[in-house]
Every structure is written in structure tokens, then in C-alpha cells.
From Swiss-Prot:
Residues 1-10 have a biased composition (Basic residues). Residues 195-261 are annotated as: SLA C-terminal. Interacts (via SH2 domain) with ZAP70 (phosphorylated) and CD3Z (phosphorylated). Interacts (via SH2 domain) with CSF1R (phosphorylated). Interacts (via its C-terminal domain) with CBL (phosphorylated). It is found in: Cytoplasm. It comes from Homo sapiens. This is Src-like-adapter 2. Residues 32-92 form the SH3 domain. InterPro entries: Grb2-like, SH2, SH2_dom_sf, SH3-like_dom_sf, SH3_domain, SLAP_SH2. Its main location: cytoplasm. Adapter protein, which negatively regulates T-cell receptor (TCR) signaling. Inhibits T-cell antigen-receptor induced activation of nuclear factor of activated T-cells. May act by linking signaling proteins such as ZAP70 with CBL, leading to a CBL dependent degradation of signaling proteins. Transmembrane segments: none annotated.
Length: 261
């Protein structure tokens, strides 16, 4: 089983674990105290029609207290206390912790993500296992998301295709950013977080209202509604509604005639 090192120089990431960077983890309290995360869905706050967070919104984790975390929105600057299931941790832009396959697809299909946008997510059921998710653009059809399981050898090396192995996730990303060996397309850029735009529920258009007519339909002579003179802009009824009412009245008249017979 061969290995093919990437020609691209890896960016320094001192806080990455050994499986990501290929070396032992380095303790950095500053990095740990300011963890980056992303919202996994719209979360209500304040009222039924108000949404404080939206899918893909970047967050900073302030504190983790069991199932409830305190997060700071990088869009609004507001702080929220939300269930941890609504949040996924993100490190160096593309490695997600606590992200399901379905949510990965939702994030990658958000506006702003081009073909080749990608992320790597840690398995929620197999600790230490990872999957690569990539957005594939298709000009003649809808974009779709392709998923690739990243296998781990006994010596810690990783691979998608058995013929290519890598010492770390960073090396894997670097290689597939240059060559689309056995995957759908080149890895172009990490999944884009939604840093701009209105929050859901903030700029919802006002509902359409229908004013009550001042006419008293009980006292109105029906002959005025269907006369030739009542057509055009001065008509109380549209042409379509007039035809529907005429048909309804004719059905009622036929029913009355049958009853009388």
C-alpha cells in the first residue's frame, strides 16, 4: 500500500491532534477557551416568530455546562444559552465534531458554497473515525453531496483509497486539494460559514390582508352582479368569480327543480 505525500505546504495548526497533524497534541489554553463552532439549525429565542440563530452561523463557545452551552454569535455579537445538540465544534475550518451526515449535507448546500466545498466530520458512533463530505456541482442538475469514509490503519495512517495512505488528515486534505484521485472533484475550500445576511424571522414580509367589503351582500340585487353593464373595472366581481357564481347558482336552480318534480 503506497503513500503519496502532498506537494502543498501545510498551514501551521498547533492545536490539532495527532490524527490531524501527524504529531502529538499540544496543550494551548487560549485555543481551548475560545473554541469555534457552528449552529446546526435555527434556534428560537424571545418569541415564537423570532429566531436568534440560523443554520451555518459561526459561533464562539464561551462555556460548556453539560447539555447546555453558552455561545457567542459572530454575526450578531449576542450571547445565547442553547442545547449542545444544536452546535458542532469546528477546528481549522474543515474538521467538525458532533456533526451528522444529514447536517453536513445541509451546511454544504447553503448559498456561498461552490462545487468542491468540503468538510471532514468525526463519526458520532465510531470514535476516532472520520468521513469526508464534498459538494459536487452538476451544471445540468442539482448539486449533490458525496461522502467518503476515511479508514485508519493499525499504524495510524489514513486512507480513502487503499492505494494512497496519509500520515494525517491535513496531509489527506492537501493531497486531494491538488489531485482528485478516486473522489468526485478537487477539494477547493472548506465549507463556508454564514457570516452575513438577515437572520430568519427578522425580515419576513408583512402578511397579505384582505379588507372586508362594505357591501351588504344580503341586500344586493344579484341581477346587478351578472348584468352586461356590470363588467369591466366598475364591476363588483372579477370575470372568473362571476362565472363561478353563475355556475353555482345554476346548479342550485337545477337541484330545486328536481326537488319540485
Amino acid at each position: 500500500m503506497g503513500s503519496l505525500p502532498s506537494r502543498r505546504k501545510s498551514l501551521p495548526s498547533p492545536s490539532l491532534s495527532s490524527s490531524v497533524q501527524g504529531q502529538g497534541p499540544v496543550t494551548m489554553e487560549a485555543e481551548r477557551s475560545k473554541a469555534t463552532a457552528v449552529a446546526l439549525g435555527s434556534f428560537p429565542a424571545g418569541g415564537p416568530a423570532e429566531l436568534s440563530l440560523r443554520l451555518g452561523e459561526p459561533l464562539t463557545i464561551v462555556s460548556e455546562d453539560g447539555d447546555w452551552w453558552t455561545v457567542l454569535s459572530e454575526v450578531s455579537g449576542r450571547e445565547y444559552n442553547i442545547p449542545s445538540v444544536h452546535v458542532a465544534k469546528v477546528s481549522h475550518g474543515w474538521l467538525y465534531e458532533g456533526l451528522s451526515r444529514e447536517k453536513a449535507e445541509e451546511l454544504l448546500l447553503l448559498p456561498g458554497n461552490p462545487g468542491g466545498a468540503f468538510l471532514i466530520r468525526e463519526s458520532q458512533t465510531r470514535r476516532g473515525s472520520y468521513s469526508l463530505s464534498v459538494r459536487l456541482s452538476r451544471p445540468a442538475s442539482w448539486d449533490r453531496i458525496r461522502h467518503y469514509r476515511i479508514h485508519c490503519l493499525d499504524n495510524g495512517w489514513l486512507y480513502i483509497s487503499p492505494r494512497l495512505t496519509f500520515p494525517s488528515l491535513q496531509a489527506l486534505v492537501d493531497h486531494y486539494s491538488e489531485l482528485a484521485d478516486d473522489i468526485c472533484c478537487l477539494l477547493k475550500e472548506p465549507c463556508v460559514l454564514q457570516r452575513a445576511g438577515p437572520l430568519p424571522g427578522k425580515d419576513i414580509p408583512l402578511p397579505v390582508t384582505v379588507q372586508r367589503t362594505p357591501l351588504n351582500w344580503k341586500e344586493l340585487d344579484s341581477s346587478l352582479l351578472f348584468s352586461e353593464a356590470a363588467t369591466g373595472e366598475e364591476s363588483l366581481l372579477s370575470e372568473g368569480l362571476r362565472e363561478s357564481l353563475s355556475f353555482y347558482i345554476s346548479l342550485n336552480d337545477e337541484a330545486v327543480s328536481l326537488d319540485d318534480a
